C-alpha cells in the first residue's frame, strides 16, 4: 500500500496539483472556467480536484457517498482557506441540483460504478444547457487496472496484469499474499465493475451523450506527482486500435455533452 493511501492530506494535495496542471487546462479547451462557473464533482473524495476551481472563484460542489471523505474535504478546504460545498449523499437523490452545472467532473470513479448505464443516463440531468462532463478512468486491461496498488503486500501491489487472471486464481493469489477480507472484497468488486474503452463509448452512445473529445495516456498525468514520471499521450496510431489500446491506456480522458 502506498503512503498516499494512508495519508489523505498528501493525496488531496497531489490531486490538486495534477488537476491544476492537467485536468483544468484540458477542461478549459471545451468550456470557459471563470468566477461563478458551477462545478460539480461526483465521487469527490477529499476534494483535491475541486481546489483549483475554487481558487479561480468557481462555485464548487463535491458529492460522495463516503461521509468520512466529505468530512476530510471540508477540513482540507478550510485549511487552504478555500470555499466549497460538500455533501455526503448519492448524487441522484439530489434532484434540486438538476440542470445546474456547467462542468461535471468524474475522475477515477466510473470504474467503480455498478450500474454504468443508469449512471450515464442520469448524469446529464445535472448539466446546464451548454455544460460538459470531464470523465476519466483507467482501462481495465492496463497493467494496474485492477487497483492492486492498494494491497498491503509490497510484492502484490507492484505486480502488473495480475488482475487479468481467472477470478478463482486471482483470489488464491490475493490470499497467498496475506491480504485481508476488506482488500479482497475491494479488488473483486473492481473486477466485477471493470470498464473498457469500447464499453464506455458504447454506453455513452446509448445514453445519448456526445463524445466531444478523447485523450488516451500511456503515462497517466497523475503519475508525475506520484512517481516522478513524465506524462505521455498515446500516439493516434495506437489509439485507433480497439482492445489493443486498452492494455496501454493508464488513463482515459473524455469530454461529454448532451
Where do the protein language model's features map onto the residues?
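Surface-exposed loop/turn positions
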Residues: 37, 130-131
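Conserved N-terminal segment of class I S-adenosyl-L-methionine
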Residues: 1-99, 103, 107, 247-254
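Helix-to-beta-strand junctions that scaffold the AdoMet/dcAdoMet cofactor pocket
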Residues: 113-114, 127-128
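A structural alpha-helix within SAM-dependent methyltransferase catalytic domains
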Residues: 51-54, 120-124
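S-adenosyl-L-methionine-dependent methyltransferase catalytic module, highlighting the catalytic core
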Residues: 117-122, 132-257
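Short catalytic micro-motifs in class I SAM-dependent methyltransferases
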Residues: 108-112
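Conserved strand-to-helix beginnings and helix N-cap segments that scaffold or border functional pockets
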Residues: 98, 116-117
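Short glycine-/acidic-enriched loop or helix-start segments at secondary-structure transitions
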Residues: 51, 72, 115-116, 144-146
Amino acid at each position: 500500500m502506498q503512503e498516499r493511501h494512508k495519508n489523505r492530506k498528501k493525496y488531496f494535495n497531489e490531486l490538486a496539483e495534477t488537476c491544476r496542471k492537467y485536468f483544468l487546462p484540458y477542461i478549459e479547451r471545451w468550456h470557459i472556467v471563470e468566477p461563478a462557473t458551477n462545478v460539480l464533482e461526483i465521487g469527490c473524495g477529499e476534494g483535491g480536484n475541486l481546489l483549483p476551481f475554487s481558487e479561480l472563484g468557481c462555485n464548487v460542489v463535491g458529492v460522495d457517498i463516503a461521509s468520512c471523505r466529505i468530512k476530510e474535504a471540508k477540513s482540507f478546504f478550510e485549511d487552504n482557506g478555500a470555499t466549497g460545498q460538500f455533501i455526503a449523499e448519492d448524487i441522484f437523490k439530489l434532484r434540486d441540483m438538476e440542470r445546474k452545472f456547467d462542468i461535471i467532473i468524474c475522475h477515477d470513479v466510473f470504474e467503480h460504478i455498478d450500474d454504468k448505464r443508469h449512471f450515464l443516463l442520469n448524469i446529464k440531468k445535472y448539466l446546464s444547457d451548454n455544460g460538459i462532463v470531464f470523465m476519466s478512468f483507467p482501462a481495465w486491461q492496463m497493467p494496474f487496472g485492477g487497483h492492486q496498488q492498494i494491497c498491503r503486500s509490497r510484492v502484490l501491489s507492484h505486480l502488473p496484469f495480475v488482475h487479468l487472471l481467472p477470478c478463482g486464481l486471482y483470489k488464491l493469489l490475493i490470499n497467498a499474499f496475506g491480504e485481508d477480507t476488506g482488500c479482497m472484497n475491494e479488488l473483486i468488486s473492481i473486477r466485477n465493475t471493470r470498464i473498457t474503452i469500447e464499453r464506455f463509448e458504447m454506453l455513452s452512445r446509448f445514453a445519448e451523450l456526445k463524445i466531444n473529445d478523447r485523450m488516451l495516456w500511456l503515462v497517466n498525468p497523475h503519475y508525475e506527482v506520484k512517481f516522478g514520471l513524465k506524462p505521455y499521450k498515446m500516439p493516434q496510431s495506437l489509439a485507433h486500435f480497439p482492445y489493443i489500446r486498452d492494455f496501454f491506456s493508464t488513463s482515459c480522458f473524455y469530454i461529454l455533452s448532451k
